[in-house]
Amino acid sequence: MSLLTEVETYVLSIVPSGPLKAEIAQRLEDVFAGKNTDLEALMEWLKTRPILSPLTKGILGFVFTLTVPSERGLQRRRFVQNALNGNGDPNNMDRAVKLYRKLKREITFHGAKEIALSYSAGALASCMGLIYNRMGAVTTEAAFGLICATCEQIADSQHRSHRQMVTTTNPLIRHENRMVLASTTAKAMEQMAGSSEQAAEAMEVASQARQMVQAMRAIGTHPSSSTGLKNDLLENLQAYQKRMGVQMQRFK
């Protein structure tokens, strides 16, 4: 796996699923391929994206700044600086300085990542802030190692939280989660269907599913009534794709 592929993988792992994630993935691909060279426009676009947490925006801004060639005097962006200040905690800053001194001696991506993984996410963010604000300089490979270690820590905590929700025995939470997933799947079906005549059937199925979820929420239904709703939708989507000549494995 190439270095940039690895960086893209780690960074995208902390971005919530949805149309915005696909958009960010495309931007990262363009940046890594040298197709997008307007850092100012890229940062302005990132700043105004909804849904993303300030830290995720800060990490993406740091990645773009490291990768896109720019004039030396280009102003640093406040939204990135604020996100990478370790919540203003002096302990984070102390640890970040210690980590920075170690990274300065490290020139490889994997070496930097291994060193960084033993620090907290707050210290890692502060260390990125030091480098972003030009208070310290490390090799690009070491900076990417720092970024990937931070993303791994964030993704780990997100995974634990997600696993807790998926394995919860609370029927109301499970019911709502199934309805949210069904609604999201229906929306994706509508986007994938496009405007061809054959798409009408898939659009109809998706529309009915969304109406059903709305009705279930409006009148309040038994927690078991949503079981299998998303899977039914995915089976419909696969049947539609088969008719269109597209063979895809199950999303489940």
UniProtKB/Swiss-Prot annotation:
Residues 165-252 are annotated as: RNP-binding. Its main location: virion. It comes from Influenza A virus (strain A/Brazil/11/1978 H1N1). Keywords: Host nucleus, Membrane, RNA-binding, Viral matrix protein, Virion. GO terms for molecular function: RNA binding; structural constituent of virion. Belongs to the influenza viruses Matrix protein M1 family. Most abundant protein in virion. When expressed alone can form virus-like particles in transfected cells. Residues 1-164 are annotated as: Membrane-binding. It is found in: Virion membrane; Host nucleus. This is Matrix protein 1. It comes from the Viruses. One of its GO terms (biological process) is viral budding from plasma membrane. One of its GO terms (cellular component) is host cell nucleus. Homodimer and homomultimer. Interacts with NEP. Binds ribonucleocapsid by both interacting with genomic RNA and NP protein. May interact with HA and NA. Cannot bind NP without genomic RNA. SMART domains: Flu_M1_C. A motif (Nuclear localization signal) lies at residues 101-105. Plays critical roles in virus replication, from virus entry and uncoating to assembly and budding of the virus particle. M1 binding to ribonucleocapsids (RNPs) in nucleus seems to inhibit viral transcription. Interaction of viral NEP with M1-RNP is thought to promote nuclear export of the complex, which is targeted to the virion assembly site at the apical plasma membrane in polarized epithelial cells. Interactions with NA and HA may bring M1, a non-raft-associated protein, into lipid rafts. Forms a continuous shell on the inner side of the lipid bilayer in virion, where it binds the RNP. The gene is M. Pfam families: Flu_M1, Flu_M1_C. It is a peripheral membrane protein. Gene3D superfamilies: 1.10.10.180, 1.20.91.10. InterPro entries: Flu_matrix_M1, Flu_matrix_M1_C, Flu_matrix_M1_N, Flu_matrix_M1_N_sub1, Flu_matrix_M1_N_sub2, INFV_M1.
